[in-house]
Amino acid sequence: MSTTPETLPPLARRSDAAYLDFVEGLREFILGKGADFEERLNSALEQSASSRGRPWGDVEEIREFVHASPLGRLRDRLARSQQEMKWHAIERSFDEQRAQLTAELSKWDERGPGRLLLDPAFEHPTYTNVHFHLQPAGYYKDELSGFLYHYGTKVFFRGDNDKDELHAKLVGTVPAPSDGKVNRILDLACSIGQSSTAFHRRYPEAEVWGIDHSAPMLRVAHRRAAMQGDAVNFAQRLVERTGFPDAHFDVTFAFILFHELP
């Protein structure tokens, strides 16, 4: 499809969007050339190594130096503060719309072209209680977790992934099997399904499945795919127990699964 409908619900008020635009700019300042923390810290590391007459050892030694330096502590404090500011604003804005947003999810749960398979008896492993990147309630304990994640990553990527450009680019780099046949694709820990839909667009005739432990994430994934007309199936399953037969898929993909292992 050349264009896609807007799948990210608007914030409650324009002042919320303006505030988060500021937070996005703050993140750009912290990570980019505005504050230039990385270059300044690299310079401090080189000067320290030169003055003591030996190179740095392992990563842990470098980490201790950075965390002990005022510049490193300032960078870390600013990075955490902007993350806290982001989540506070998104959570507050979506919480004010909770009734409308839950109704919006329910409206799409049974719609096609793909399927949404949730397990009412699903038991979450203890490792899913680790809350990455400070997201409030983690990835599954709030029925709006999928919407929170979607807007949170919008700020995280500083607008560079608003139309799933990053996922499309990554999916485009995945090599096809040696025989060139791609009939079934599995997206592990698919969250809100951005890579899953990208695979469907690359291989429109293939059967695409995205699995995740989080029902709120999967509901948003299904809604996004259905709104865009992408025939992708989503199921609440664990990556260590997918429920599919061995060698069932021609392509298996994991976008950020191994980054977020506790």
Regions found by a protein language model. Give the residues of each.
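Intrinsically disordered, low-complexity terminal regions of plant proteins
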Residues: S2-P55
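N-terminal auxiliary segments of SAM/dcSAM-dependent transferases
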Residues: W56-Y140
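A short mid-domain helix/strand-loop element embedded in enzyme catalytic domains
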Residues: P125, Y139-D164, Q194
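Conserved alpha-helix/loop element of class I SAM-dependent methyltransferases that forms part
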Residues: L148, N161-K181
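Class I SAM-dependent methyltransferase SAM/SAH-binding core
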Residues: L186, S196-R241
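A short acidic, Gly/Pro-enriched loop at the edge of an enzyme's catalytic core
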Residues: E240-T252
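A short SAM/SAH-binding and catalytic strip from SAM-dependent methyltransferases
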Residues: V251-P262
